[in-house]
Amino acid sequence: MSLIVKLGKKGKRIVKKFITPVEKHTVGYTRRIERVKTSKRICAMTFDDGPMGMPASPDRFDGKSLTDVLLDTMKEYGARGSFDVIGDTSANYPDKAGKIGSAAWGGIKFDHYPDIHCDDKGGAEHNDRLIRRILEESHEITNHSYRHLIFGKKPFVYGAREHLNGLDDAVADLNRLHQLLKTKYDYTMTLSRPPHYVDKMPDGFTSYDAYDAMHYQYMAASFDGAGWLPSTHTDPEQALQAEVQAMIDPIRHALEKDPDFFCGQIIFQKDGYNMAKRTPVAFALGEQLKVLQEYGYQVVSVRELMEESPFADVGQDDPLFEKLVELAKDHAIVFSDNHLRLDDKMTIGELAMLLAPKKEAISRRVAKIRKTKKAGAYDGALSWCQENGILPTSAKAEQFVETLPEAYFEQTNDFTRRGVYAAYKK
C-alpha cells in the first residue's frame, strides 16, 4: 500500500473519530444496502469500474478481456454477480497519470477506466459485447455513474480530483448511463454505488437525494475483496502472489472462525486494474468462490440477495415481514442504514414519512434545500401532513408518537415502530 493511501486512510480514521459527528440515520426512500438479514448461506458479489475490454495483468488468459475472465470464472462456479459499470471516461481530460501504487495512478484530476489514454477500452459505451454477455449470463448491472466523477470533495486521498457541482449534475450523469442501458438493452438498473463512496455534494444534497430522484437503492458492501490494493513487494511476481493471497486468506479465515460469517453479506470486487496496474482478481476470484462453495454458499447478485430480505435487521422469520416488504415498496419506513429498528419508539417525523406521498415528501424537501442549503430529513413529509390536517401544526419531528390518526390506523396503544406499522391500514 502506498504512503499516500496509508496517510489518507489514517487521516480518515482520525477525522471520523475526533471531528466528524456520529452519523444520525433517518428514515427515507433510499437506504444503503451493505448486507441483509438471513440465516441462509447466500451472499452477493459486486464488481466495480468495468466492463474492461483490456486483458488481465499479467495476461495469462490468451488475451481475453478481464471482464471475460471474471465471467468465465463466475460461470464455472455457478455464481452470479452485480457488475457496477461506468459509461465512458473519455471526456475526463486534460489530465496526466499519477504515481503507480498511489490512488492517482490512473489520473490526477480524473479517473480513467481501464487506464489513462485507454478510455476507449472501458465502460458500457465501448463494450457492447461484454454488456450483452453480462446480461445473457443472468448477472445484474448497476449504475456506477457515467463519467465516474466524485459527487463532492474528498480531501485526503482525492484532494486534487475534479468533482460534480451538485444534485442536478449527479442526476444527469446517472441518468445518462441509465438511459444507455434502457434504450440499447431494454435493461432497467435499480441500484447504484457512488464513485469512491463520496456522498456529500457542494450544494447541500447527498447521493441519497440523487438516488431518490433515480428511484435507486444505494448499493454498498460489507466485505472488501481487497483486489484493489497493491503489494509493496518490488518483484512483480511476488507482488502478484501477495495480492492474490490477500484476497483469498481473509475469506478463508472468516469462514474457519464462523461458517455463517458471509450469510447475507455483499463482497466488493474490482473489474479493473489495482493501483499497481495488476489484476489479482483474475487469479483470486476462482479460489474465493471455491472456498465459499466448500462452505455451502450460493453467490448471487445484490438484487437476488434482496429478494431474500431487503432489510439488514429483519428477516423472513419475523411475523411482520411480508407487510413490511410491501410497505417499503411505496413508503419510507426504513432508516438510511437499511435497519427498521422495530423496537424503538416512533417519532412524529418517521410517522410523517409513512403517511406523506413520496413525491410530496421529496419535492418539498428538495425545494427547501435549494432555497436555504439545508433541510431536515422529515421537513417535506411533515409540512405536507400538517397542511392536510393529518398531523397537528404544533408537532415536531423529534417528538414521540402518542396518538395515531384514525383514518390510517387500527386502534393500538403500541407506539413502537413495530406497533405502528402493524396497525397501519395498508
Per-region residue spans from a language model:
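Catalytic-site microenvironment of enzymes
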Residues: L3-I4, A282
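Active-site beta->alpha N-cap acidic-glycine motif
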Residues: G8-G159, N165-M189, P194, V291, ...
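Extracytoplasmic/secreted proteins, especially bacterial periplasmic and envelope-associated proteins
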Residues: I42, S65-V69, H126-R129, N165, ...
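Short strand-loop junctions, especially beta-strand C-caps/beta-turns
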Residues: D48-G50, I86, P195-Y197, K270-N274, ...
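Sec-exported extracytoplasmic/periplasmic mature domains
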Residues: K75-A79, L135-E136, N175, Q179-D186, ...
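Conserved beta-strand edge residues that scaffold enzyme active sites
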Residues: D88, H148, G225, M306, ...
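Catalytic domains of cell-wall/extracellular-matrix polysaccharide-remodeling enzymes
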Residues: D119, G123-H126, R133, Y146-Q293, ...
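N-terminal propeptides
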Residues: S309-K426
